[in-house]
Amino acid sequence: MFLLTPVLVAVVCILMVWIFKNADGATKRREEEPRARAEARPWVDEDLKDSTDVLQVEEDADEWQESEEEVEHVPFSHTRYPEKEMVRRSQEFYELLNKRRSVRFISNERVPMEVIDNVIKAAGTAPSGAHTEPWTFVVVKDPDVKHRIREIMEEEEKINYLKRMGPRWVTDLKKLRTNWIKEYWDTAPVLILIFKQVHGFAANGKKKIHYYNEISVSIACGIFLAALQNAGLVTVTTTPFNCGPRLRVFLNRPANEKLLMFLPVGYPSKEATVPDLPRKPLDQIMVTV
């Protein structure tokens, strides 16, 4: 029979301790890696996630309205330009939008409301899933309401900068010279808050699915920015990290609406500056197959 000598027993014990320690360390590393990766990623506001959920229709069928309406189809009216005219128009439109910048220094000079109306009507021409048009544009001009919006936003933004966003994100923003203090929310003559409707309501009170509501509203936001630039106004896009629910309640918006983006709108102040950032050239953003 094989007998374990004291030396051999000691070696075996040391080996077993080493194996267990390494196994325990590997387990801890596996547990910590996802947490570290999560902390390195930008913080995600759950309120901003697209809430299109077809399964919900099957689970709560009685609450949802199926679309049965018939829509007449009519001939499409189209203006076709000569090729040279197409090139000229496309180049001029590009040059116009290439001048668009995120401006954080906004004058308190009054903006014609007819211009705001037209800009929002232009945004409302955006395509949407099943033509549900799941957007609501809230226009705020009242100084007291604007100031309260600023207070709510700055309270949450301070937490974002100090805790939620993480050091990498905050470092990446340093070149833009931004922080949680947003004076332009008071000075801008108009604030536009853009809500996505996660579902709608039929005439009988039943819910209507708004397919791809966040993508649809995001397209409308892009057209909105282009229309502002075309009208000679400036803005800076702001995402409502964690202040969306509070602002929704403050503005008395219904529970089916979620704040997607809000923008101060006006003319640039005389002392306005912007970071001198280049845009990617065409060969870095386009692939032809």
UniProtKB/Swiss-Prot annotation:
> In what tissue types does this protein appear?
Detected in thyroid (at protein level).
- Catalytic reactions of this protein: 2 iodide + L-tyrosine + 2 NADP(+) = 3,5-diiodo-L-tyrosine + 2 NADPH + H(+); iodide + L-tyrosine + NADP(+) = 3-iodo-L-tyrosine + NADPH; 3-iodo-L-tyrosine + iodide + NADP(+) = 3,5-diiodo-L-tyrosine + NADPH + H(+); L-tyrosine + chloride + NADP(+) = 3-chloro-L-tyrosine + NADPH
Provide the binding site for FMN. R100, R101, S102, V103, R104, S128, G129, T237, T238, T239, R279
Q: Does the keyword Flavoprotein apply?
A: yes
Q: Name one Pfam family in it.
A: Nitroreductase
Q: Which positions does UniProt annotate for 3,5-diiodo-L-tyrosine binding?
A: A130, E157, Y161, K182
A GO biological process of this protein is: thyroid hormone metabolic process
Q: Where in the cell is it found?
A: Cell membrane; Cytoplasmic vesicle membrane
UniProt entry keywords in alphabetical sequence: Cell membrane, Cytoplasmic vesicle, Flavoprotein, FMN, Membrane, NADP, Oxidoreductase, Transmembrane, Transmembrane helix
The membrane topology of this protein is: Single-pass membrane protein
Please give the cofactor(s) recorded in the UniProt entry for this protein.
FMN
Q: Would you say which domain of life the source belongs to?
A: Eukaryota
Q: Where does 3-iodo-L-tyrosine bind?
A: A130, E157, Y161, K182
Q: What enzyme category does the UniProt record give?
A: oxidoreductase
Q: Any idea which GO molecular function terms this record carries?
A: FMN binding; iodotyrosine deiodinase activity; oxidoreductase activity
Q: Give its E.C. classification number.
A: 1.21.1.1
TM region(s), chain numbering: 1-21
A GO cellular component term found in this entry reads: cytoplasmic vesicle membrane
The record, for InterPro entries, names: Nitroreductase, Nitroreductase-like, Nitroreductase/BluB
Family to which this protein belongs = Belongs to the nitroreductase family.
What the protein does? Catalyzes the dehalogenation of halotyrosines such as 3-bromo-L-tyrosine, 3-chloro-L-tyrosine, 3-iodo-L-tyrosine and 3,5-diiodo-L-tyrosine. During thyroid hormone biosynthesis, facilitates iodide salvage by catalysing the oxidative NADPH-dependent deiodination of the halogenated by-products of thyroid hormone production, monoiodotyrosine (L-MIT) and diiodotyrosine (L-DIT). The scavanged iodide can then reenter the hormone-producing pathways. Acts more efficiently on 3-iodo-L-tyrosine than 3,5-diiodo-L-tyrosine.
Relate the assembly described in the record: Homodimer.
Name by which UniProt lists this protein? Iodotyrosine deiodinase 1
Which organism is this protein's natural source? Answer: Sus scrofa (Pig)
